[in-house]
């Protein structure tokens, strides 16, 4: 993981040959980036040691977010400056509402989570705040603001 960095992206490129924009963002976010990547929850998901009950709760919470993420993408498709950007975002939206949604449904079935549970689940306060930020930035903000918030959603 990149070490802490507080300079510009140009400075980062000069000090890190072959460095990528995402490397610079992660370096600027230290130590929080490493803390998130090494958090016990993140590690347990990655190595398969997450208890099924905890994973089911996580999936239910994440599923409450998917509807708002789909709406966010809809706003951004509408605001995208041209057909290439609209196509890329609508492709993501199609994937989210088909294959990713199917993953959730298969997972809920495998974990024994009844449809009434995940269909009526309320968002927790952190998810709700993040969803509201996404919807506000993409619906009321500029295209760039919406994309910036979308990036953070996809990295979390």
Regions found by a protein language model. Name each.
Residues 2, 12, 17-21, 26-28, ...:
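Hydrophobic alpha-helical segments
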Residues 5-9, 26-50, 69:
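Short alpha-helical hairpin
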Residues 13, 84-156:
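Active-site-proximal alpha-helical scaffolds that flank and shape metal-associated catalytic sites
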Residues 30-35, 49-79, 98-99, 147-156:
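Alpha-helical bundle segments that constitute or directly flank the non-heme di-iron/ferroxidase center
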């Amino acid at each position: 993981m990149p070490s802490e960095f507080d300079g510009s992206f140009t400075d980062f490129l000069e000090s890190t040959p072959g460095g990528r924009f995402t490397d610079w963002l992660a370096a600027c976010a230290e130590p929080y980036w490493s803390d998130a990547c090494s958090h016990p929850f993140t590690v347990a998901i990655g190595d398969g040691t997450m208890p099924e009950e905890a994973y089911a709760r996580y999936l239910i919470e994440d599923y409450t977010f998917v509807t708002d993420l789909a709406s966010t993408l809809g706003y951004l498709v509408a605001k995208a400056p041209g057909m290439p950007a609209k196509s890329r975002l609508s492709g993501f939206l199609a994937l989210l509402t088909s294959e990713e949604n199917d993953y959730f449904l298969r997972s809920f079935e495998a974990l024994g989570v009844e449809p009434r549970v995940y269909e009526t689940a309320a968002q927790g306060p952190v998810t709700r705040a993040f969803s509201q930020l996404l919807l506000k930035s993409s619906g009321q903000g500029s295209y760039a603001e919406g994309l910036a918030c979308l990036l953070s959603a996809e990295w979390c």
